[in-house]
Amino acid sequence: QVYAEVLFGRLAQGPPGHAHGGAISAVFDELMGACCWVNGYPAMTAQYTTRFFKPVPLNEDVLYCAEIKEIDGNKISLKAQLINYTGEQFATAKGLFILQDIEKFKEMNLETGANVTYPHLTQ
């Protein structure tokens, strides 16, 4: 599992006083991707869905949690949730990520001069 504590500020506002759904979804995507990578699976998003239950207030700490549910060949299925510290659920997400060839990432790194390292991967 991977966790992230997030506080959405005024620049992430959608409805008055609440976070924009796109900002909420972007964190889900990033966290599910990070969950793959820190577990040794260099993967990219194929698709994800977000289900919203209630608006997320601005300027309040919320907690994201993501976990890998299944690995089938090069397909990695994940689930995630967004709650507050009293356990109130704001949203959930499901994602499908595709395992990538780390050598191709390294080649792209050299070609673009991005200077990205992958110390957590053993491949």
Identify the residue ranges that each predicted region occupies:
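Non-catalytic surface loops within mature trypsin-like serine protease
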Residues: 8-10, 54, 99-101
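Charged, low-complexity, helix/coiled-coil-prone segments
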Residues: 4-9, 23, 105-113
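Glycine-centered flexibility sites
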Residues: 14-17, 21-22, 33, 59
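Catalytic strand-loop segment that frames the active site of acyl-thioester-processing enzymes
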Residues: 1-19
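Hydrophobic beta-strand-centered segment that forms part of the acyl-chain substrate-binding groove
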Residues: 30-65, 90
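A structural signal for short, well-ordered beta-strand segments
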Residues: 4, 48-52, 66, 80, ...
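HotDog/MaoC-like acyl-thioester-processing domains
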Residues: 57-58, 69-123
